[in-house]
Amino acid sequence: MKVLEDYRSLVHGIGSLDFSGDAVPCKLLLTGDTAFPVLVTPRKDVLIAASRYGKGKVVVMAHESYLNTNAFMDFLKNAVSWLSPNSEANIGVHKGLNLLTDNLSANGSKVQNTSTLIEGLGVFCTIGYDDSQDKQIISFVREGGGLLIGAQAWHWSYSHKQENVLHHFPGNKIISVSGVHFTSDYGEKGNICVMENIPQAPIYTSFDFSLDQKYLLKGMSQLDISGSSIPSDLLLHGTLSFPVGLSENKQCFLGATYYGKGRVVVATHEGYLSKSELKTIMLNAISWLDINQNRRIGVHKGLRQFAELLQKENIPCNISSLDPDLSVYCCTSYSDAEAKAIHEFVAEGGGLLIAGHAWYWSSQNSDLDVLIQYPGNKILNKFGISILDRTIPGGNYNAINPDESSQQYHFRRGLCNLQAELRSGAEVKPPLSIWMNKLRQDVTAFMRLPANPIISSIQSQFVEMMQICEIPNVTKQCPVSSCSKEAFILCLAQECFNVCDESHILEKEPSITVEIDGTNPGNNAWRSTGLYLAPRKTAVLEFPASAVHQGLQVQVGCQSDDLSSADKYCRAPVVVRRFHVDSQRVSVSCFWGGLVYITVKANSNLGIIPVKVYEAEPAPIYIKGKTSLDTWIQSIRNLPAPWAELITENIILTVPSDAIRSLSDPEALLSLWDKIMVAITELAAIPKKLPRPERFVADVQISAGWMHAGYPIMCHLESAKELTDLNIMQTGGIWGPIHELGHNQQKTNWELPPHTTEATCNLWSVYVHETVLGIPRSQAHCCLQAETRANHIQEYLRNGSNIEQWNVWTALETYLQLQEGFGWEPFKQLFKDYQSMSGIRNENKSKMNLWAEKFSEAVQTNLVPFFEAWGWPIEEATHSKLSVLPVWEKDPMKSYLSARKSNSN
């Protein structure tokens, strides 16, 4: 690692450095992505730092007297050697640093005494109280020069109380471009040991941003981000970043930061820049960014509306790309073409207003990491801000109170507070307890940030912090609150044990070779390997070269529900991990363990892929028509892996292994499931072989309900028996599982949400129970008994056939009456016809009229009176079109309407 080599060059032969003299150092603040601490005190004060800028290097001392003190000379000689672009470089030394001059000269260096930067120098050694040459020194370093500088800012701050030390202190006007700052805080003194490896940087340094927030929020009591624009959330991970706009849940849609000599404001939707309700804050932002009020504003061509807004406010601006002569540049986050130039522009004093969201990019680039590869983050990560793929609900949010800035959520502050709480063992108290959910989300994102010395240091400190904690043993009987310290540990365990150690694995013979079907005409699909990876273990998978970079992923675990929004956890919220197959050898691990899958993206045509797998163990897997029943009974069902799979052509059941230990005839069970799935496809009018088999996965906790649809369909552990017990299925039925399979067949073109969301899926439940299981609808579910059905209809009519009350069983009744009158064939025909229809308006009234029309035509009967009895808003055009057909003489609603009319008389 290059930075470690740099560090060891600087401290070579140095055991300790004595800061116990009269000089009082200041703390140094590190913010840049190339800055690293060289000397850190026990109290975590940085007293020496180094960095790179452009082609050059910088070493910073926390007091100028250290440049002229015997105790530091060996270190300073190392520093000058490291800073020198070559061994023959001329060294310029400030005239007051005679001891340094003598020592460098005695060491064979070519030294010139000078109080200013002059031509021909390779290294310049100076003190940080004169900024008259700041631009020249910055240019000198950028082009490859070395800078050794010492100063402290605490004394200066006494006589400049109204000025911002980070921005106005002379030394900071020189070194801040490198991501190192002098501060007004006293540093710890003493004889400090030099570490063998780079010392850890402080996690958090407190700064008061209240004046900046007041400036930016002047004239704003609320921030209105309602409307169609959906913003992303921001991760403010830099020490000098701060929130400007927050939702009620502390999600940040507007943030700002200092970087080098410049400033940055980030909005997470470009539409906000020209949104009338936010005009005041955007104008404030332009003014805040334009540090010297030069009013040279450049606006990228993608933000023409914002340029027009500025011009209407008499703020001069031009449509342009980035120009170093601008004072403020405004652009979107959707391109990184100017990233390098933007970094230099801001570091050297420019202001950047950048806007855009990342959620759409992430949805279109699901195999890429938004934190690393999203264009905007290639610009912003360096500044200490990242745009996330998480969205924020629109709304009219109260402006934050700058006077309460010390109590505002800040990622680094929260992490520092958590460290103290974990060490103390005490219960988490406000405000940290209020921040825990947001902090957990931010830590998860932060741990994925690209490495640099400061980020890596904080990441490693977090890992150390977590590794001293005991992982809570949560169960359904012993859950933990989502806001608790235990929940935080549970959620982040994977991030802290994210180590794939393959060093010992490849010496062994391959344990198993599996063949994966890489052809997938359906949506993204999981292919079972039949293998299980134990918790905290590492497996290695070897793919043929033809399978690399084809969108394949290795997935460990199948309980894919994210429970992060739950109030309590019976398991960690995320227990599935995925790894891109971007090389022939892929190492995988998961803190929680799990079954191993290869995911094949939609419309892949890769054929059969042989995969060698090291260190995973066989799981109890039965494949209908392939697995020997004798082998199943004798050995497979007794394999120790905790999860089992039962696989047939159109469905895969994943259940606890304990649920199948006594299963002696999986062939008969799966034969029944085959019949069920054929019935599912029959009613849906789709081919009997699904392009992607359905999946059921049992879990101790799921994200919604007793079961929920999707891929996979998730259910509670208690449902495993319902899925795998042939007797239960044949005698009592399985309404719930078929209900979820029905959900997966609902289509937007004929669905009428929210009314039929929990209704039409039950058509499949009725169909399967009657045609496959031989269980009539009145026995399949208690709500379909004749008396209960009649009560649903009567109550609905009694309330005036209000379509707002047409839901679930009442809505299902409409479809059941049609089925009982005309059979299943019209449904099958319509479901088939709808598959080839286009241009259907996604609006319920229009879809109701279309269904009434199509069903009437399918059965050659005018069903308008029937649907109107149910309160459907049938239009005159539909009336007219269907009037040529005979009315439904056996309309079941007639008797209910007649009875109601008689009762009213």
From Swiss-Prot:
Gene3D superfamilies: Peptidase M60, enhancin-like domain 2, Peptidase M60, enhancin-like domain 3
Record GO cellular component, one term: plasma membrane
Disulfide bonds: none
Residues in Peptidase M60 domain copies: 524-823
Pfam families, alphabetized: M60-like_N, Peptidase_M60
Gene Ontology BP annotations: positive regulation of protein targeting to membrane
InterPro entries: Class_I_gatase-like, M60-like_N, Pep_M60_3, Peptidase_M60_dom, TCAF
Gene Ontology MF annotations: transmembrane transporter binding
Assigned protein family: Belongs to the TCAF family.
Function, in words: May play a role in the regulation of the cation channel TRPM8 activity.
PANTHER family: EXPERIMENTAL AUTOIMMUNE PROSTATITIS ANTIGEN 2-RELATED, TRPM8 CHANNEL-ASSOCIATED FACTOR HOMOLOG
Annotated protein name in UniProt: TRPM8 channel-associated factor homolog
Annotated source species: Xenopus laevis
